């Protein structure tokens, strides 16, 4: 399996994403936002950071980058797409995931480890975790409040699209939502950082299973 790790001006988690892909047994390349083809890639990783300085709003300017049409194409083809933090914001901006990310209720930047519950372990991103397993991922964001209308929330619940919830909501996210998938289950966005949770020496290795799950799920379908 070969991942494209997207790089925008202001990305700062691209190396972490690359490392996570390699550690999970996949191949990976950094792909500049000005590229117009993702031919040859089996999945996309959209990292955190502050793409284009978060001007206008988080993810807004990245949403019109040349590479985005290819991200949409791969997503529509059923290939896995993971967006973390700013990557999640970008996925909502381009319409691959519902809802929006607002400023934290505290209006402060939050950076700490958070306990999270695996709310759905039947996706290509979470199928190596136990049902309702508690994991620890770092968060680092100022605009991590997940917002959606009641109709969208009811749809997320009905379709089992909520995959990750906060045990102690740090930002005011609707119903403690930390991560979701699209209806097809191949596009995932989350504010916490699994790519920063790969080594026990750093405090948690809870993120390892997420990337291994992506690779294993792809191999089951393609090898």
From Swiss-Prot:
<comment type="subunit">
    <text>Part of the FGAM synthase complex composed of 1 PurL, 1 PurQ and 2 PurS subunits.</text>
</comment>
<dbReference type="GO" id="GO:0006189">
    <property type="term" value="P:'de novo' IMP biosynthetic process"/>
</dbReference>
<keyword id="KW-0547">Nucleotide-binding</keyword>
<feature type="domain" description="Glutamine amidotransferase type-1">
    <location>
        <begin position="3"/>
        <end position="223"/>
    </location>
</feature>
<comment type="function">
    <text>Part of the phosphoribosylformylglycinamidine synthase complex involved in the purines biosynthetic pathway. Catalyzes the ATP-dependent conversion of formylglycinamide ribonucleotide (FGAR) and glutamine to yield formylglycinamidine ribonucleotide (FGAM) and glutamate. The FGAM synthase complex is composed of three subunits. PurQ produces an ammonia molecule by converting glutamine to glutamate. PurL transfers the ammonia molecule to FGAR to form FGAM in an ATP-dependent manner.</text>
</comment>
<dbReference type="InterPro" id="IPR029062">
    <property type="entry name" value="Class_I_gatase-like"/>
</dbReference>
<dbReference type="GO" id="GO:0004359">
    <property type="term" value="F:glutaminase activity"/>
</dbReference>
<keyword id="KW-0436">Ligase</keyword>
<feature type="active site" description="Nucleophile">
    <location>
        <position position="85"/>
    </location>
</feature>
<keyword id="KW-0378">Hydrolase</keyword>
<keyword id="KW-0658">Purine biosynthesis</keyword>
<feature type="active site">
    <location>
        <position position="193"/>
    </location>
</feature>
<keyword id="KW-0315">Glutamine amidotransferase</keyword>
<dbReference type="Pfam" id="PF13507">
    <property type="entry name" value="GATase_5"/>
</dbReference>
<dbReference type="GO" id="GO:0005524">
    <property type="term" value="F:ATP binding"/>
</dbReference>
<feature type="active site">
    <location>
        <position position="195"/>
    </location>
</feature>
<dbReference type="GO" id="GO:0005737">
    <property type="term" value="C:cytoplasm"/>
</dbReference>
<keyword id="KW-0067">ATP-binding</keyword>
<dbReference type="GO" id="GO:0004642">
    <property type="term" value="F:phosphoribosylformylglycinamidine synthase activity"/>
</dbReference>
<dbReference type="InterPro" id="IPR010075">
    <property type="entry name" value="PRibForGlyAmidine_synth_PurQ"/>
</dbReference>
<protein>
    <recommendedName>
        <fullName>Phosphoribosylformylglycinamidine synthase subunit PurQ</fullName>
        <ecNumber>6.3.5.3</ecNumber>
        <ecNumber>3.5.1.2</ecNumber>
    </recommendedName>
</protein>
<keyword id="KW-0963">Cytoplasm</keyword>
<comment type="pathway">
    <text>Purine metabolism; IMP biosynthesis via de novo pathway; 5-amino-1-(5-phospho-D-ribosyl)imidazole from N(2)-formyl-N(1)-(5-phospho-D-ribosyl)glycinamide: step 1/2.</text>
</comment>
């Amino acid at each position: 399996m070969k991942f494209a790790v997207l790089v925008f001006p202001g990305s700062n988690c691209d190396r972490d994403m690359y490392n996570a892909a390699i550690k999970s047994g996949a191949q990976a390349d950094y792909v500049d936002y000005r590229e117009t083809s993702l031919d040859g890639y089996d999945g996309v990783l959209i990292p955190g950071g502050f793409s284009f300085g978060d001007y206008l709003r988080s993810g807004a300017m990245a949403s019109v980058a040349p590479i985005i049409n290819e991200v949409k194409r791969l997503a529509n083809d059923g290939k896995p797409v993971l967006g973390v933090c700013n990557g999640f914001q970008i996925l909502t901006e381009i319409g691959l995931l519902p809802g929006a990310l607002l400023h934290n209720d505290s209006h402060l930047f939050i950076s700490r480890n958070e306990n999270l519950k695996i709310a759905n372990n039947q996706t290509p991103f979470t199928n190596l975790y136990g049902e309702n397993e508690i994991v620890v991922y770092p968060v680092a964001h100022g605009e991590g409040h997940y917002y959606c209308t009641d109709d969208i929330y009811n749809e997320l619940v009905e379709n089992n699209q909520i995959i990750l919830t906060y045990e102690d909501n740090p930002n005011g996210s609707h119903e403690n939502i930390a991560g979701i998938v699209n209806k097809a289950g191949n596009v995932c966005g989350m504010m916490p950082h699994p790519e920063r949770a790969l080594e026990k020496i750093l405090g948690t290795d809870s993120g390892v299973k997420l990337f291994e799950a992506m690779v294993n799920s792809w191999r089951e379908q393609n090898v």
